[in-house]
Amino acid sequence: MNILELELLTDSITETELFYTGVIGLKTISKTNSSVSFAAGYTKLTFRSSENLKPVYHFAFDIPNNKLLEAFAWIEKKTEIMEVVPPEKIADFYNWNAKSFYFYDNNGNILEFIARFSLDNASEKPFDGLSILSVSEIGFVTKNVSQLSDELFNKYGLSVFSKQPKLEKFIVLGTDTGLFILVEENRDWYPTHQKAKSFWTKVVFSNNGKTREIEISD
């Protein structure tokens, strides 16, 4: 699965553009009074204007799997990286064959840079925002994780991620290149104590040769 487009809400278009261009180094590809879009590798990442909603999301960017420490040092110069298990700041997902680190954006969204060692995506270029390969994960928050998982399977053919067994309150759908993270409402967003809540989200993704769209109301 590949996430081709991701649309989220923000209470501040201006501050969001400053963060994503200045800190992460993404290129702005379009902007209006009510939205701004960036190129995050092959994913088009769009923020649409909201008012006093304080929306918070959890999503991940894939980076070349030989650039984790370089990306860490590059981001650390610009913003604070979270501790996962103090004092460690790099998470090792052994079952996923991946490592990642986390930081907040200007909206309080929890962002993740993840290196997946099962993929062939190494790069010899110095790391910067143009090194980002895609948005590879987005969290969906629901009152009933199993029910949402079944709905997404029935409607879109999305199967459980082979490297992550199903849990009652946490199910991952997709493949190494694109994942939907289904979590129960009010569960802590890893690695924070931020309670997960649902906000409007739209995703355009490709799976098994078909391009589909999901819209989560809230």
Language-model regions: role of each:
Residues 1-14, 118-151, 155-159:
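N-terminal beta-strand motif that seeds the catalytic metal site of vicinal oxygen chelate
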Residues 43-44, 109, 178-179:
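Short acidic/polar mixed-charge low-complexity motifs
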Residues 13, 61-106, 140-218:
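Vicinal oxygen chelate
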Residues 49-54, 117-119, 185-190, 218:
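A short, sequence-level motif marking secondary-structure junctions
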Residues 27-32, 115-116, 159-164:
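Conserved catalytic-core motifs of GNAT/GCN5-like acyltransferases
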